[in-house]
Amino acid sequence: MAEKMKLEIVTPYSKVLDELVDEVTATGKMGEFGVLPGHAPFLTSLNIGELCYKKDGQAVSMALNWGYFEVQDDKIIVLVETAERSDEIDLERAKAALGRAEDALKKLTPEDKQFKVYEAALERALIRMQVAGKAARK
C-alpha cells in the first residue's frame, strides 16, 4: 500500500492544488467521508463544504463549492466550482456575504425562485467563515 496519494483540485479557472498527501476528508451528499492511501475507487458528488487534507502531519482546510470527488488507485481528483484555502479567505467579505444572504432570505418564501440561490449563498458564507476561522487559530 502506498504511503501517500496524489490530490488534484481543479476549478473551471485553474488547477488549485496538485500535492502528495497523507489523507483527505470532504463533505459529500451523504455526509462527511475520509480517504487514506489504498482506498477502493469511487466517485461521489460534493456539497458546499469543507475539504481537509493532511500533508506531513500538517492539516490544511479548504472551502469548496459543489462538485465531484473521484478516487482511482492512489489519486484523488476533485472537480469543483470554487476552492479556497483557509488562509486565502477574506473573513470580512464572507461575513458581508452572510449578511446579504440573511437579509434576502428574510424577504423571501421557500416558493420564491431566488430562495434556493440565497440559501446556497448563506451556506457558502457559513462554510467560508468556518474554514477561515481555522486559519486564524493557527
Curated annotation (Swiss-Prot):
Gene3D superfamilies: ATP synthase delta/epsilon subunit, C-terminal domain (1.20.5.440), F0F1 ATP synthase delta/epsilon subunit, N-terminal (2.60.15.10). Pfam families: ATP-synt_DE, ATP-synt_DE_N. GO terms for molecular function: ATP binding; proton-transporting ATP synthase activity, rotational mechanism. It is found in: Cell inner membrane. Keywords: ATP synthesis, Cell inner membrane, Cell membrane, CF(1), Hydrogen ion transport, Ion transport, Membrane, Transport. InterPro entries: ATP_synth_F1_dsu/esu, ATP_synth_F1_dsu/esu_N, ATP_synth_F1_esu_C, ATPsynth_dsu/esu_N. The keyword Hydrolase does not apply. It is a peripheral membrane protein. GO terms for cellular component: plasma membrane; proton-transporting ATP synthase complex. Belongs to the ATPase epsilon chain family. HAMAP family: ATP_synth_epsil_bac. Produces ATP from ADP in the presence of a proton gradient across the membrane. PANTHER family: ATP SYNTHASE DELTA/EPSILON CHAIN, ATP SYNTHASE EPSILON CHAIN, CHLOROPLASTIC. F-type ATPases have 2 components, CF(1) - the catalytic core - and CF(0) - the membrane proton channel. CF(1) has five subunits: alpha(3), beta(3), gamma(1), delta(1), epsilon(1). CF(0) has three main subunits: a, b and c. This is ATP synthase epsilon chain. The lineage of its organism: Bacteria, Pseudomonadati, Thermodesulfobacteriota, Desulfuromonadia, Geobacterales. The gene is atpC.
